[in-house]
Amino acid sequence: MTAFELTRRDALAGLAASTALPFLSSPAFAQATAADAQANALLDSIAENLLRFYPQTATSLGIDKDARAAMRAQLDDRSGLTQQRIAQTLRADLARANAIDVAGLSHSTRTSVEVVRSAYTTALEGFRLPYGDVPVGSWRNTPYVVIQNVGAYLDIPRFLDSEHQIATAADAEAYLARLADFPQQLDNETGRVMMARYKGLIPPAFLIDKALTQLQASAKSAREGGGLVESIERRTREKNIPGNWAARARAIAQKEVAPALERQIAELTLQRGMAKNDPGMWAQPSGDEYYRWALKASTTTTLSPDEIHNIGREELRALQGRMDPILRSLGYTNGTVGERMQALGKDSRYKFAPGDKGRAEIMAFIQERVRIIRTKLPQMFNTLVKGNLEVRRLPPEEEPGAPGAYGGAGSIDGTIPGKFWINLRTTELHTKFDLPDLTHHEAIPGHVWQGEYANKLPLIRTLLSFGAYSEGWALYAQQLADEFGVYDDFPAGRLGYLQGLAFRACRLVVDTGLHSKRWTREQGVRFFVDENGSKAEEVASEVDRYCSWPGQACGYKIGHTAINRERDKAKAALGARYDIKAYNDAVVLGGNVPMDVLAKNVDDYVARTRA
């Protein structure tokens, strides 16, 4: 890890001293061999080569300091030329990773090598496609560089406000430097959107409409100063940092950011006149090829669209079979499971108040559910992390195109907490029976919790992730909450959990339906409403998300099923020696991996337990 290694060692030492957690004694952190040291030095070099393209990630991880201090004033370069440079770097570093002899390596180091090989191979396949964004080792592969839930216009304002910390005048100067680069990154993406148009790629009209609404709101905010100015003004005032920060930020926002947003609006307005309403990749040039790759990237498997579609229908039937008796016990006896879940969703006992009163209720409700689940964690894991968590509302201008919530871990050193972002555009999006499950998925023991373990791994492992693992773990986290009793006195909450799993089974059906079976957008929405009792307003945004992130929705249930399959295998192999806490440690300490590597990690856990 070169310059990064001392920082991580200090962080781990501080963690161990302050919390007395058994992290460093884990097999995942066993003493490295000489061969490991050589391999890890190469992997550290590969990590640094990747990180230099993503200075925003360095800030989010809290490692934009010392040798990387210049990154603190930089944004990710979103130009087409830089995409080519990333691909060139991946090709060279994949060759280096492939040349490592894994025979003499420890299991943990061998896992890191396999992770790099898998992530880089898949990313390079994506870069060979004629369009789209290919975030390396990430979950947001998309054919559309700017759309309702993708683009610098969304990412950078949120990043500047929530990830770029301001404690000194130098931090404020770095904020302004990044803000000054924002227009260039908008133009870089506008140029790539134009190039995609020349290749025949036009997003569906209904997605462009959403994107234009949000872009127009962003442009209006920039012309007025808005959040880009308020963020630095508020935080420099709170820290008593003298300077004309607000005036400088306002000049950039009004004179540079707003015109760049207007240029992006003009391009998408042009494309709106050419757009159709076909939602799936089947309607796009090279769309079938793109979708096959997107499924592989999301699931880390070679399952076909038809296979995934059928898995979704089978798992949905099984989950509805578990929901039916609970619904009957609550007095909901008439109609399909989906119809009865719709009725449950209208039950006033489970609704939040409208408006700001209900928004406050939701935030308090989440905090209470986090408190409850924290008491269960020592029963689930031998190795614990802090679970550094902040619950925040999504920026209102982002909410119309966003899902109900999302979350992720904070910085390596803990200075930036993990975030649970909740969409509160209307309190009708959430109920008291489904919000606990959402909290377990996004926060603890889901994304925020798992991400903290990943932050203790070598840097390359922190940078690379796989949707099937990330989302599969988050679903497994929901399952653990149920298995450890959080719904024992709350049957409606258990229904919310099962509905959440069924929702992910529906995703397998709808995603493949849209992109492979030529479903309409309306068919996708109706499937969720009819089969799972989902709220039409919520799933309309969900279906739009599947249209802009093809394949991404399939990683969830495929990953969850794989984690349970490996658990069943470990139980059968170990018998009385099987321990749920040890199994959970093996999965989460093994880090974010493709599903075939997960199986190897579980095999290693079984072998160690038998020894």
Regions found by a protein language model. Give the residues of each.
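N-terminal maturation segment of proteins
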Residues: 29-611
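N-terminal secretory signal peptides and thylakoid transit peptides that target proteins
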Residues: 2-22
